[in-house]
């Protein structure tokens, strides 16, 4: 929806006026690193969730995550859920074993125990509801659960990650210039359509 896209860009532009210039070259991990390692900044309005930064002894400062701001009176929605997944190569000589492993590592028993204890960020909701895990990571999953539940899953087609990277660069340029929102939305729509042909 072009109208909502323009509103979102305008809102980002308004927020960006309050940012330090370093924000335009930092990725979400760098933001979490600065928040957890210095006392220079205390808040980031939107950031990817990294539960390790909420654990004791991971960094100097323990971060507290919360749900994203509700701008629509529909709850904390509009974020996207992504992350690193697991896949099985079609060239594998042990597909059955790989499939068995995939089910095991994604399963609740593994996710709430060895996966989490080894520094992984669980994607299984049973682990998200686990009180011990929440106690150990400053209630990361409890505090962000509404956002997680209302997020949309990042598209999985081959060209999407390239689109995400390139569109992020273009939006970043827009935030620091006088590019028209109307022109930018048209460009992003074209890029997204082209991402299906990668």
What are these language model-derived features?
Residues 1-27, 68:
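Glycine-centered hinge/linker elements that transmit conformational signals in sensory
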Residues 173-188:
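Short, charged, surface-exposed loops that flank catalytic or proteolytic processing sites
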Residues 1-4, 46-47, 89:
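Short beta-strand->loop
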Residues 28, 44-52, 84:
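Beta->alpha turn/N-cap motifs
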Residues 28-44, 169, 173-177:
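Short helices/loops that flank or line small-molecule/ion binding pockets
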Residues 13-17, 34-46, 87:
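Glycine-rich, aromatic-lined ligand/substrate-binding cores of catalytic
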Residues 17, 55-121:
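Extracytoplasmic/periplasmic substrate-recognition and gating elements
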Residues 116-169, 173:
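Long, aromatic- and glycine/proline-rich binding clefts that accommodate carbohydrate-like moieties
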């Amino acid at each position: 929806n072009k109208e909502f896209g323009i509103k979102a860009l305008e809102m980002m532009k308004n927020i960006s006026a309050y940012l330090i210039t370093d924000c335009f070259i930092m990725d979400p991990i760098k933001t979490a690193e600065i928040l957890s390692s210095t006392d220079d900044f205390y808040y980031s309005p939107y950031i990817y969730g990294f539960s390790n930064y909420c654990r004791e002894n991971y960094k100097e400062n323990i971060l507290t995550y919360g749900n994203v701001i509700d701008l629509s009176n529909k709850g904390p929605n509009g974020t996207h859920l992504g992350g690193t997944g697991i896949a099985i190569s079609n060239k594998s000589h042990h597909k059955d074993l790989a499939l068995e492993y995939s089910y095991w590592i994604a399963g609740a028993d593994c996710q709430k125990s060895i996966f989490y204890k080894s520094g992984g960020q669980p994607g299984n909701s049973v682990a998200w509801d686990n009180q011990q895990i929440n106690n150990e990571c400053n209630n990361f999953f409890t505090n962000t659960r509404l956002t997680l539940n209302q997020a949309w899953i990042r598209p999985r087609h081959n060209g999407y990650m390239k689109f995400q990277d390139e569109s992020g660069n273009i939006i970043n340029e827009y935030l620091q210039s006088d590019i028209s929102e109307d022109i930018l939305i048209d460009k992003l729509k074209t890029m997204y359509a082209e991402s299906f042909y990668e």
